[in-house]
UniProtKB/Swiss-Prot annotation:
This is Protein MANNAN SYNTHESIS-RELATED 2. The chain crosses the membrane at residues 7-26. Pathway: Glycan biosynthesis. Widely expressed. It comes from the Eukaryota. Keywords: Carbohydrate metabolism, Cell wall biogenesis/degradation, Fucose metabolism, Glycosyltransferase, Golgi apparatus, Membrane, Signal-anchor, Transferase, Transmembrane, Transmembrane helix. It is a single-pass type II membrane protein. Residues 1-6 are cytoplasmic. Residues 27-423 are lumenal. Belongs to the glycosyltransferase GT106 family. It comes from Arabidopsis thaliana. Its main location: Golgi. It is an enzyme of class 2 (transferase).
Length: 423
């Protein structure tokens, strides 16, 4: 029996179409889904989505001369401006709060506290920093620059270093606010409590980890932009440490022009999630070391690529990644010896979380192997810094893939909240 060549070609095209459609469905889950937080932030699920690639991103990859690396774009400038109506007013009382759960949460917590204090006409009290374990507390100045915070916010809200002695903690009402709290919510739900008690303590909860910008036509509050992207900077000693670690990574990356990849991959979280399938074609909630290694190799990153992992300490399950990419390091391998006693003495300390967050924000490529606010807020900082190469993991059928196809939808679709604040 003869074979009709046209039927064969049509069959091949049909199969190819279904493969491409499956990949697109997989990636469309990445940040289109509103993920709910239940208790521990690490329970948040994460979905991949293959996105339509913009011409500019494709050209950026094609223009590069060193494989899959994407050139940085220019740093964006703040679009927000503080009007007279936004300026600080005389204080009526105090707003207190704490920074908890790591720097990816600090960004949202400081923003919500500033918004509440601003729209209540209250004075903001400098927060403390609390770790995941009871009694694990630090001063704000242990990690962040106090003077920078006060100076940045002085035009919109007054900040004091501590609560006056005449204010009793028993007289402070505890108020829970949803992240990205808006002025209307503050007026309706918080202002009556503030007027009744005179002082409040704000705790932020996260009904969603979505950081997509508001719907078209809706304006982002300039005070929110200022607080989220302008208020938190590392204090000099911590910043110097982060810079030294980045320079060590660049030194290991001479063959790739000093460029390196940061991967948010923590074994404890991967084991908790079990990397189960979600039901979308090929989609997963997280990716382990072997899957990430294959993903990067198929995108064209060679074995000489330097990789930084957020994993606190090396574990045997990471060996496969180091077998494929020998220049793979955790923080203990690149931190100066004289700094380890202070910054690595406590496992999962706030110092370690901060180091991970700021190195991931500054790396040439960022790969989120696990979901959550770490991914979303790291992308926000990278957008402001002009570092758009955030590659969302996926199982690539075949032997290779185009890096531009795996750029985070936050960037390829320009729907991250940061695009409302920078231009």
């Amino acid at each position: 029996m003869g074979v009709d060549l046209r039927q064969v070609v049509a069959g091949i095209l049909t199969i190819t179409m279904f493969v491409m459609l499956g990949q697109m469905l997989h990636r469309d889950y990445f940040d289109a889904v509103q993920e709910k937080v239940q208790g521990d932030a690490h329970d948040i699920e994460f979905h991949g989505s293959k996105v339509a690639v913009e011409d500019g991103l494709v050209r950026a990859f094609e223009a590069g001369t060193k494989g899959p690396w994407m050139e940085d774009s220019h740093e964006l400038k703040p679009c927000w401006s503080i009007s007279q109506s936004d300026e600080a007013v005389s204080s009526k009382g105090y707003v207190t709060f704490s920074l908890t759960n790591g720097p990816e949460y600090h960004v949202s917590q400081i923003t919500d506290a500033v918004m509440v204090a601003k729209h209540l006409g209250a004075t903001l009290v400098l927060p403390d920093i609390r770790g995941s374990k009871p009694g694990d507390e630090m001063k704000f100045e242990d990690i962040y620059d106090v003077d920078k915070l006060i100076k940045t916010l002085e035009s919109v809200v007054k900040v004091v270093r501590k609560l006056p002695s005449h204010v009793s903690l028993r007289d402070i009402a505890i108020v829970k606010v949803p992240t990205r709290v808006a002025e209307d919510y503050i007026k309706e739900h918080i202002d009556p409590i503030f007027k009744s008690k005179g002082n409040i303590r704000v705790t932020t909860y996260f009904p969603s980890v979505n950081l997509r910008k508001s719907s078209q036509g809706a304006e982002t509050d300039p005070v929110s932009c200022l607080a989220m992207f302008g208020s938190l900077e590392l204090q000099p000693a911590v910043n110097e440490l982060v810079e030294s670690m980045i320079q060590r990574l660049k030194t290991h990356s001479k063959k790739s022009g000093g460029r390196f990849i940061a991967i948010d991959l923590r074994v404890e979280i991967l084991e908790k999630k079990n990397c189960h399938e979600t039901g979308a074609v090929g989609s997963k909630t997280c990716y382990n070391a072997q899957e990430i290694a294959l993903f990067l190799r198929k995108l064209g990153f060679d074995s000489d690529t330097t990789i930084y992992l957020t994993q606190p300490r090396w574990e045997s399950s990471l060996n496969i990644l180091k077998d494929i990419f020998p220049k793979t390091y955790t923080k203990e391998a690149i931190m100066p010896s004289d700094k380890k006693t202070k910054y690595l003495e406590l496992e999962n300390s706030e110092y370690e979380n901060v180091i991970d967050f700021y190195i991931s924000s500054r790396s040439d490529v960022f790969v989120p192997a696990i979901p959550g606010l770490f991914y979303a807020n790291t992308v926000g900082k990278r957008i402001a810094l002009g570092k758009p190469q955030v590659l969302v993991p996926a199982e690539i059928s075949g032997t290779s893939g185009l890096p531009a196809n795996y750029i985070s939808p936050y960037i390829s679709k320009k729907n991250h909240l940061a695009y409302s604040c920078f231009c």
